[in-house]
């Protein structure tokens, strides 16, 4: 760290410590650092970037987010003059592989077992299936795209462990599929980042991303949509991204330039997640008796949630109701569901999923 003959260091230790302290020390000593460690960049990326700027050094982390997709450098360089409004993506290959398997007919347990056999999922798959890995990557994208470094607790996260094959069957009937999507918005309503499974229209670019592939969709005032897709992780894509950062770093060092990442500034306030609006897909099991649908619709109406469509299928003395709502805030939908759950005619609230808008 104190060797003046060393200009560039690659950190691939994994975990947060001791790598974090090593990177801080290296940047403080004017050395540039390349890391593939999303945990560190998500945890203290803004601090590390500031440290690099103060000490005329650079921090490179292309391999930390969707390593096989060159997305960070275009965001930093090619789009530096663009006013970005939304970045959304499939940024965890394990969960996307599992959801693709479920769309093709597997149950959740079989999809997970196969992912583990193939090495996509760890023996403890929590970080992948509960959206934690995608959350860290979303935090990095938030920093680069909008100049916001949210705390871990500020990024609402919901995983895929409650998704069932029946959800996919219904999604298909609605010309949609289900994806775990990280979504970051920065507009007149404010800034918000979240990760959760959504029903997404089959025509949307993210719907066609299958298996362990990743994709990032960038939207701005002048560019409409740009889509970056490819392998998100693995030894070869990660190594390729690191080598690319090495070459970029060598160019920077050779030209005696630094601070190649001019961070954008957040122009809005952080928006409370409860105020974020979504359309909703709700699946209920109810007693097949007169007045049930009217009672449920009335409850939604009391909380200002408007129903767009309803499908009802009878199953003996029970019926399955599938409702899709117009856009409504999280808090209003949650209040509606809480009250609907207490209705005597409602047997089970089977699924509540957001619809990508």
What kind of feature is each model-predicted range?
Residues 1-8, 12-18:
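A structured beta-alpha segment of the ubiquitous adenosine-cofactor-binding alpha/beta core
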Residues 4, 43, 66, 70, ...:
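Conserved active-site and cofactor/substrate-binding residues in soluble primary-metabolism enzymes
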Residues 13-29, 36-77:
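Rossmann-fold NAD(P)-binding glycine/threonine-rich loop
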Residues 32-34, 307:
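A short hydrophobic/small-residue beta-strand
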Residues 53-133, 140:
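Rossmann-like NAD(P)H-binding beta-loop-alpha module
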Residues 101-102, 110-208, 213-215:
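Substrate-binding/catalytic subdomain of NAD(P)-dependent oxidoreductase enzymes
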Residues 204-275, 279:
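ATP-dependent carboxylate/acyl-activation modules
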Residues 246-357:
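A conserved regulatory-domain signal marking ACT and ACT-like small-molecule sensing domains
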């Amino acid at each position: 760290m104190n060797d003046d003959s060393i200009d560039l260091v690659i950190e691939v230790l994994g975990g947060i410590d001791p790598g974090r302290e090593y990177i801080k020390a290296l940047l403080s000593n004017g050395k540039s650092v390349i890391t593939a460690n999303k945990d560190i960049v998500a945890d203290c990326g803004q601090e590390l970037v500031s440290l690099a700027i103060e000490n005329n050094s650079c921090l490179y982390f292309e391999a930390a987010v969707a390593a096989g997709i060159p997305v960070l450098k275009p965001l930093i360089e090619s789009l530096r003059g663009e006013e970005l409004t939304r970045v959304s993506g499939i940024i965890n290959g394990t969960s996307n592989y599992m959801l693709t398997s479920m769309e093709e007919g597997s149950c959740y347990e079989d999809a997970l077992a196969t992912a583990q056999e193939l090495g996509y999922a760890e023996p403890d798959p929590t970080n992948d299936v509960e959206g934690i890995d995608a959350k860290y990557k979303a935090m990095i994208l938030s920093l680069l795209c909008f100049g916001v470094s949210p705390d871990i607790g500020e990024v609402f996260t919901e995983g895929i462990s409650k998704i069932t094959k029946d959800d996919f069957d219904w999604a298909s009937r609605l010309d949609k599929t289900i994806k775990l999507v990280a979504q970051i918005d920065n507009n007149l309503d404010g800034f918000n980042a979240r990760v959760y499974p959504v029903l997404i229209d089959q025509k949307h670019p993210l719907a066609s991303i299958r298996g362990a592939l990743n994709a990032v969709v960038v939207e701005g005032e002048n560019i409409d949509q740009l889509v970056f897709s490819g392998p998100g992780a693995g030894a070869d894509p990660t190594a390729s991204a690191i080598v690319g950062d090495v070459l970029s770093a060598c160019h920077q060092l050779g030209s005696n330039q630094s601070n190649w990442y001019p961070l954008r500034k957040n122009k809005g306030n952080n928006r409370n997640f409860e105020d974020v609006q979504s359309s909703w897909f709700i699946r209920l099991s109810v007693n097949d008796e007169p007045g049930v649908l009217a009672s449920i619709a009335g409850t939604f109406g009391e909380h200002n949630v408007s129903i767009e469509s309803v499908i009802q299928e009878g199953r003996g003395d029970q019926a399955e109701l599938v409702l899709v709502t117009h856009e409504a805030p999280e808090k209003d939908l949650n209040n509606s569901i809480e009250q609907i759950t207490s209705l005597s005619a409602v047997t089970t609230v089977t699924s509540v999923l957001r619809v990508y808008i």
